[in-house]
Structure formats: structure tokens, C-alpha cells
Design a protein with these regions (language model features):
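Conserved MFS/SLC helix-loop-helix module at the cytosolic interface between two early adjacent transmembrane helices
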Residues: 63-101
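Helix-loop-helix hairpin linking two adjacent transmembrane segments in secondary transporters
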Residues: 103, 140-187
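Structural signature of the two symmetry-related core transmembrane helices
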Residues: 80-93, 280-294, 375
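Helix-to-loop junctions at the C-terminal end of transmembrane segments
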Residues: 65-76, 264-278, 362
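Cytoplasmic helix-loop-helix junction between adjacent transmembrane helices
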Residues: 107-144
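Juxtamembrane intracellular "pre-TM" segments in multi-pass secondary transporters
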Residues: 2-8, 187-220
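C-terminal transmembrane helical hairpin of 12-TM major facilitator-type secondary transporters
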Residues: 279-324
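Intracellular juxtamembrane helix-capping segments at the cytosolic ends
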Residues: 117-129, 319-332
Length: 390
């Protein structure tokens, strides 16, 4: 078995494996988005109740980030990942057989919490890569994660339309079992970065948050960028179900292909961050999201307008996420999992807030309200970047 040493480099095979599994595991959090209209009809629930499935999944992810990712500094990361995969597979089966919304909500919470596996991988890429390749390799893993997000929407949209939404979650459980087998064969064990109690570990997370203002800035402005992006996806299925589209879940999935530009951008941003700097990329990303939402507001009743908005809001987010996450992990490399916990927990709180706000205003002001939420979140991110030079 290969042994990894800090700053000494990672074999390409391990990076590729982490990138692929990052995509397959994070997909668990996004299968539900194109299926919301189908679930709503099947269980006879309102749009706002159905939207909470996505909100609760994001909350679960944030909880997993906060309580589980710090353990990567204290326990075997390989074993933690395998346990999370097992629970995610079981909860996908619960989703598939759920007969009421309470089962869906409970399973969604645990699926979200146990799908944080990519956030073990990204610090691994940062910790063990050679210094000149850290941002590039983190971007490579992140591009796999983003490809998983966009592929999950496309695949679940089509499977939901032609086989049914429950079948999608049975398939998700099978995918997790396959990933477990690959992990057991390929993933090496890694040296732990912390010796002590779990309580002491979590205390250091709070200390890092208090003592490192740069980490707070990186995390909060990226969180508002993620909230802006989640606003469009949380209500897209409802928007497309209305005239002039009258489209099904397969069309929601097709629009997920637009996100491929975001995946491509992640790899490019990882190479360019050291040259142009974190601050410039964060500013650029927030500005691009504002432009995207202006297009969604003016041309959101056309496929061309929606496609342009989705592409731009996604590329804008990747510029914000990778640049700010890279800065966060480089701030304290010896505590990379804990720094990543702060960043990603804040990030997904922002995503949950964007999802909730968009879902609420959809019932009050339809697509106009969703666009206002998206623009507002992107504008806040822009203002934070303008008021801080890091």
C-alpha cells in the first residue's frame, strides 16, 4: 500500500480515485432537486414542503461538516469515509421506500451528513501535494465533485422521468457499495494530525475561528456565493413545470449539463489562483453571479436565458469557492481538516439559507422573488470582498 507524506506528492491514481468518488458521493445531496415535482405529486404535498427536502439535505451536510470532518485530524480518515458511505447507502434505501415526508426528511438529513466525504479528500490533496501543485490538485478533486453535482441532476432527472424517483435512490445505494469496495482497495492510511479528546478537538475549531479573521472572511463570502447558486436550483423544477415550459424532471436534468462549465472552471481556477490572487477571483465570481441573476430576471421565461444564467452563476461560484477555500487551507495547513470544517460548514449554511429563502419567496412572488434572493446573496458576497483586501 502506498504511503503518503506531507508535501511530498500524491500519485495520480489516488488523485483520480478521490476526484471520481468525490463526485459520486456528493451526488447523494443533489439527486432530489430534479425530482421535487415528482415527489410532490406522489406524496401529495405542497411545493414548500417538498422544497424542505433540499433544505434539510443541505443542513445535514453542514452538520456533517461541523461534527465529522474535524475527526479527520484525529481518527483514520479511511475508516471514517467507509462508515459514512455505509450510512449513506442505508439512508438512500430509506428514501426509496419512504411512504411519508417525515421519512424523507429524516433520511435526507443523514444522507447530507454522511455525504461530506469530498471534504476529507480536498484537505488530503492540499496536505500531501507538493507546494507548487497544491491549488491545482485541490482544483482537480473539486472538479470531480462539481462533475458529480451536475451529473447527478442530469441522471436523476432522466431516471425520475422514465423509471420513477424511488428507483433513483436504489441506484444511489448501489453506487455507494461500489465506492466502498474501491476505497478499501486503493485508499492508503494517513498520519493523524491531532492527539487528544474530541471535545478538545472541537475547542480548537472554535479557537481557529476566533483567532483567524481571514478564515472568517474566506468562509462567509463564499457562503453567500453558494446561497446565490442554490437559489436557482431549489426552485428550477417548479419554474419549469409552469408555462411557457410545462417541462418534466428530465428537462431539469438536462439543464444540469450547463454546470459542466463550472467543473471546467474549477480546474482552471486552481491553476490561476497563485498568479492572480484570492481577492481578485472572489470579486470576479460575485460580479459574475450578479450578471447571471440579471439575465435570469430579464430572460428567465426562455431556455436561452436560463442556460446563460445557470452557466454564469456556476462559474462565478467556482471562482469564489476554490479561491477562498485554497486561502483557508493555506492559512493553517497543520490543521487543514479543522480549517476546512469552518469553511465548508459556513459554506453550506449559506447554501441552506439561500435554498430556504428562495423556496419561501417562490410561494409569495414566484420567479421574481427567487431572482431577488439570488442577486441579494451575490451582492452581499461582493460587498464583503470590496471591504476586505484579502
Amino acid at each position: 500500500m502506498i504511503q503518503l507524506k506531507e508535501n511530498q506528492g500524491i500519485p495520480r491514481s489516488i488523485l483520480l480515485m478521490m476526484s471520481i468518488i468525490a463526485g459520486l458521493t456528493v451526488a447523494n445531496c443533489y439527486y432530489n432537486q430534479p425530482l421535487l415535482e415528482l415527489i410532490r405529486h406522489d406524496l401529495d404535498i405542497t411545493e414548500q414542503i417538498a422544497n424542505l427536502i433540499t433544505v434539510i439535505t443541505q443542513i445535514g451536510y453542514a452538520l456533517g461538516l461541523f461534527f465529522l470532518i474535524p475527526m479527520g485530524d484525529m481518527f483514520s480518515r479511511k475508516k471514517l469515509i467507509l462508515v459514512n458511505m455505509t450510512i449513506a447507502a442505508l439512508m438512500a434505501i430509506v428514501m426509496a421506500v419512504a411512504q411519508n415526508v417525515w421519512m424523507l426528511w429524516g433520511a435526507s438529513l443523514l444522507i447530507g451528513a454522511c455525504s461530506v466525504i469530498p471534504q476529507f479528500f480536498i484537505p488530503i490533496a492540499g496536505q500531501f501535494s507538493t507546494p507548487e501543485n497544491k491549488s491545482r490538485n485541490m482544483g482537480f478533486v473539486l472538479s470531480g465533485l462539481l462533475t458529480g453535482i451536475l451529473a447527478s441532476r442530469v441522471i436523476s432527472g432522466y431516471i425520475g422521468e422514465w423509471l420513477g424517483w424511488r428507483e433513483m435512490f436504489f441506484i444511489a445505494a448501489l453506487v455507494m457499495v461500489v465506492c466502498m469496495g474501491i476505497m478499501m482497495l486503493m485508499m492508503p492510511e494517513m498520519k493523524r494530525n491531532y492527539v487528544g479528546t474530541y471535545r478538545g478537538l472541537m475547542t480548537t475549531v472554535a479557537e481557529i475561528f476566533i483567532l483567524h479573521p481571514s478564515i472568517r472572511i474566506y468562509s462567509i463570502r463564499a457562503a453567500f456565493g453558494f446561497g446565490s447558486m442554490m437559489a436557482i436550483w431549489s426552485c428550477l423544477a417548479f419554474h419549469l413545470a409552469q408555462p411557457p415550459f410545462n417541462a418534466g424532471s428530465d428537462m431539469v436534468g438536462m439543464l444540469g449539463l450547463c454546470g459542466i462549465m463550472g467543473a471546467v472552471a474549477a480546474s482552471s481556477v486552481g491553476k490561476l489562483v497563485p498568479r492572480f490572487g484570492i481577492h481578485k477571483f472572489s470579486l470576479f465570481g460575485a460580479a459574475m453571479q450578479i450578471i447571471a441573476w440579471a439575465i435570469a430576471l430579464l430572460f428567465g421565461d426562455t431556455y436561452a436565458g436560463l442556460i446563460a444564467a445557470i452557466i454564469l452563476v456556476d462559474i462565478g461560484l467556482q471562482c469564489q469557492q476554490l479561491s477562498n477555500q485554497s486561502g483557508c487551507l493555506q492559512e493553517i495547513p497543520q490543521a487543514s481538516n479543522r480549517a476546512n470544517t469552518i469553511f465548508m460548514t459556513t459554506y453550506f449554511i449559506g447554501g441552506s439559507l439561500g435554498t430556504f429563502c428562495a423556496g419561501y419567496v417562490w410561494t409569495q412572488a414566484d420567479w421574481l422573488g427567487v431572482c431577488i434572493v439570488g442577486i441579494s446573496f451575490a451582492f452581499i458576497s461582493l460587498m464583503i470582498s470590496l471591504s476586505h483586501k484579502k
